Amino acid sequence: MGIAGCSGGGDGGDGSDGGDGSDGSDGSDGGDGSDGGSSELEIIHWWTAGGEQDAYQALLDGFREEHPDVEIVDNPAPGGAGSAIDTVVQNRVIDGNPPSTFQIWPGQALTPYTDEDLLEDIGDSVWDEEMRDAYLGDVVDLARPAGNLVAVPINIHRLNNLFYNVSVLDDAGVDPTDIDGPEGLLGVFETLDAETDVTPMAHQTQSPWSSLQLWESIFIGEQGVDAFQTLIGGDVSGLEDEVRSALQLLADYLQYIPEDAGSISWDQGNNDVISGDAAFLHQGDWAAGQYRSAEDFEFESDWDMVPFPGTSGVYQSVIDSFVFPTGNPSPEATEQFLNYAGSVDAQERFNPVKGSIPPRTDVPMDEFGDFLSRQFEFWKSSNCR
């Protein structure tokens, strides 16, 4: 898993998306890729948790309405945060049996494929002038790490969110907007642990991505964006003490998470925030998709979010996209799907359910709700993304 950072310029949003994973098949044989190829569209993805699975189905429903003759072969890769998808896809590509398309973070995560010419240039077939004009410019740049457009971004997630149960914090007398930096959050955890019966922070340690994500926000909150960008750029000289400090604070945080953290998924942990058994959750804003689908759990009155302490003004982002592998078993169906994924209709259906904002600027925000509309304003006003 790559280290997530603030996206911008040519740097990718190659952090981690959520999901508890589910076992899927290891792929299906495609056609020979000649002419239109197979009418089966095989999609490898990792969207298997409740809210994200609903969003994925909303995307497929819209595609089926426009292309009812295409048979979709749904192939979720097992493992949280896409932890298994690279192995699955790379093995398939090496064996000459690529899927029709697969989910991937644009930016640096694409380079192992573009370096080996394993992705088709879709600059003419998919990225027409209307689509290019509608997309946010820095997101378009992520789709062409080697110059040619090879991916279609479909969403933008923010990672440095600190979600909380409003009534739990009200009862404890905690104002999350007053928390002063990552160290201040530890003090709040200590207070909650000593004075209440709730778990201070919902969290999973079954797979490492949630803790890595949390460490990144701690580091940015303590040291700032410039130090973080230096670190992920490979220049670690002079940052050893800063890295150790963030790791120590992460270890301190993990004293205040659920006892069963090692056996649960992120969304199972998030249920504790919904039920009032946990106060906080550090997670990407896909967590909001779960809140949206919960009964009688409303934004601002029941749950809310502040930027992780110390990271106000930073939109630490991760973006999902789909690509067109070379040797494609279903070139016509894949092109149709990528065209749809980049459309207003697809992004209007998918993102409100997913808990993400659209990379197109012309998607109506009416169905996104107050939280995602606020996130979109945060994105536009952030000084680092």
Q: What residue spans do the PLM features occupy?
A:
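Alpha-to-beta junction loops
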Residues: V93-I104, L118-E120, E195-T199, S275-Q283
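Conserved N-terminal structural module of periplasmic/extracytoplasmic solute-binding proteins
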Residues: C6-P112, E116, D128-M131, F297, ...
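Hinge/lid segment of periplasmic solute-binding proteins
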Residues: W105-L159, D370
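Short helix-initiation/N-cap motifs at beta->coil->alpha
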Residues: P76-N91, W105-Q108, D180-G187, D260-S275
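Mature extracytoplasmic/periplasmic domains
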Residues: G50-D54, G62-E65, L118-L119, W286-S293, ...
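Helix-loop-helix "hinge/cap" segment bordering the ligand-binding cleft or interdomain interface
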Residues: E65, R144-L214, E222-A261, N271, ...
